[in-house]
Amino acid sequence: MQLKNLIFAAATAAALPATDAATNEPFGVISIHSGSGVQYAPINAALGSIFAGLKSQNASCSNPQDQTATFFLDDGALYLYDQSATPQELYVDRSGMGQGKIGYTTGAQPAPKNGERKGWSIDANNHLQFGGKDLIACPNSIEGAWSIWADAGVAKPGYNEGCEGIAARVEVSKNPNVCSYTSN
């Protein structure tokens, strides 16, 4: 009987992600797409949007040398990490106009029309997803960065060329950078 329990426990543990980010635990995100220019690019936040490989976020941070965004999940909603009572909150516009646009609003601002706040999750592979789908990166954005989009069934979101699906790998932050990110 004990051997059966041991095998069950081992199988259960093997199915769990290695670095699972718990609710409200701060984390960073790295883009994964083998053989691509976006491979291992850190995710950034600036001008009310999300990017990969942006050289400067122009954010006000506790550690200004760290140019990566720090996030946390709470009940399916995704926030930019801050010690404010009203942190910046992400939204996704999957409408025909938004085509999967990911943005964020400052403080207590409402989401724009068609903006969805909930639907964020971390899957069993430790990938950040929206609506159960991986994210999309499109090249040639500001400062040579890649713009990040939710999968809304549009191959070229925002009419961008060269877009690629990415796995947005979650990495738990041991020393999270507290920032206030720029809005548009």
From Swiss-Prot:
Superkingdom in the source lineage: Eukaryota
UniProt signal peptide: 1-21
Known glycosylation sites: N58
Gene Ontology cellular component annotations, sorted alphabetically: extracellular region
Gene Ontology biological-process entries: sporulation resulting in formation of a cellular spore
Secreted keyword on record: yes
Keyword presence, Transferase: no
Keywords from the named record: Cell wall, Glycoprotein, Secreted, Signal, Sporulation
Induction note: Expression is highly induced by the V-ATPase inhibitor bafilomycin B1. Expression is also increased by the anti-fungal factor phenyllactic acid (PLA).
Subcellular location: Secreted; Secreted, Cell wall
Stated role: Cell wall protein involved in development of asexual structures such as phialide and conidium development, and thus required for spore formation. Plays a role as a general stress protectant produced by the fungus in competition with antagonistic bacteria.
Family membership: Belongs to the phiA family.
Protein name, per record: Cell wall protein phiA
